[in-house]
Structure formats: structure tokens, C-alpha cells
Amino acid sequence: MTEQVTDHNLLKHRFRGYLPVIIDVETAGLNAKTDALLELAAITVKMDQQGYLVPDQKCHFHIQPFENANINADSLKFNGIDIHNPLRGAVAEAIAIPEMFKMVRRAIKEQGCQRAVIVAHNATFDQAFLQAAVKRINAKRDPFHPFAMFDTASLAGLMYGQTVLVKACQIANIAFDGKQAHSALYDTEKTTELFCAMVNRLKDLGGFPLLNPK
């Protein structure tokens, strides 16, 4: 009987059938239940022919504060968002989140995965705001695992000894423009580069696949 060989250059075999999706949110505070979600970006990943992780599809939305949302002025000053600027082109949560879900479900199908898992820097924050918005709009067919996540702050601490995004990027030789930080799209792009760099470095060091898996 021929032993089945696992192709580790396929993404579906790298994370137990999960598709990593890197996200970042910008908000009007720290409380996911009461404070407004103002910006959301997401990037999927794929494997190249050599089994290295690379960025794939992306989406980005400016989001209108939900009804009666709390707006913390200090948070707006920190992220530089002017919620009254018509040029933001902000859309409702009920538009942005289902559109992001469509992109993720499409990527899951393309990569032969079963479900998505959130990847983010200090991921509990982003996951909490996304889940709160999903609950507010009663979104259907959520492709994400309800509690599993990959936190790049923790992973970068392990790989590089740095937990701050910009410092981890510097150690990983990833260019980082501090003036563009706290834009959800830019931060997601840099977090994606960092996540891919860490996964690929582990591959180069012989850390995956395991030579003698039990």
C-alpha cells in the first residue's frame, strides 16, 4: 500500500486547514462594545510554488460609526481620522463586513481550506472589534474561527525579541514609514509582510515541516 505524501507547499496543509487572514482596525476608543469601528482592512495569503507564504487579496473600508457609538477624541487624535470628512467615503458596517467576508470565503475555496483564522498585531483587540460589529449587524456566514487567532506581537517576540510592530519590522528588514502608521490598510500590509517573513524564516530554518512527525 502506497503511503500518502502530504504536499507542504499547499497552504491547506500548513495551518491545519485554516486560511490566515491578516486584519487591522482603527477605532474611536478601546471598548469594542461601545466605541466606533472606523476603519477595517484585510489581506489573505497564499503559497507560491516553493511553499513560501506571500500576500494575496486585499480589501479596505472606511466605516461609519454605528448608531449611538462612543467617539473618543483622544483616539481620533491618535489615529488622525476625521469622521466628518466626506472624502473618507465611509460605508456602514453592514456593507463593509459582508464584503470582507465574501473575499475571505472566496480565498478559502481557492486555497482548499476549511475556515479562516484572524492574524493581527495584538490580535485580541482587532478580533474583539470585529466580533462586536458582526454581532451588531447580525452578519451571516462568518468564515473566521470564533476564538483562535495568530498574534504577530507574540510571534515577533518569539522570532525577533520585539513586540512593537515597527521594531519587529525593522529587525525583519521590512521598510516601515511611521507617517503612514495607524492607517488600517498600511498597518495590515506591514503586518502581512511580517507574518509571511516569520513563517518563511521558520521554513528556511527547517522548523516546518517536521522531519519526524508523530
Swiss-Prot record:
Arranged from A to Z, the UniProt key words for this protein are: Exonuclease, Hydrolase, Magnesium, Metal-binding, Nuclease, tRNA processing
Q: Name one GO biological process term.
A: DNA replication proofreading
Annotated Exonuclease domain ranges read: 21-195
Give the top-rank taxon of the lineage listed in the UniProt record for this protein: Bacteria
Under the cellular component aspect of Gene Ontology, which terms does the record hold?
Answer: cytosol
Q: Which cofactor does it need?
A: Mg(2+)
| Free-text cofactor note | Binds two Mg(2+) per subunit. The active form of the enzyme binds two Mg(2+) ions in its active site. The first Mg(2+) forms only one salt bridge with the protein.
Q: Does the keyword Nuclease apply?
A: yes
- Name the SMART domains for this protein: EXOIII
Q: Where is the active site?
A: 182 (proton donor/acceptor)
Summarizing the function annotation, the protein's role is: Trims short 3' overhangs of a variety of RNA species, leaving a one or two nucleotide 3' overhang. Responsible for the end-turnover of tRNA: specifically removes the terminal AMP residue from uncharged tRNA (tRNA-C-C-A). Also appears to be involved in tRNA biosynthesis.
Q: What is this protein called?
A: Ribonuclease T
Q: Which gene encodes it?
A: rnt
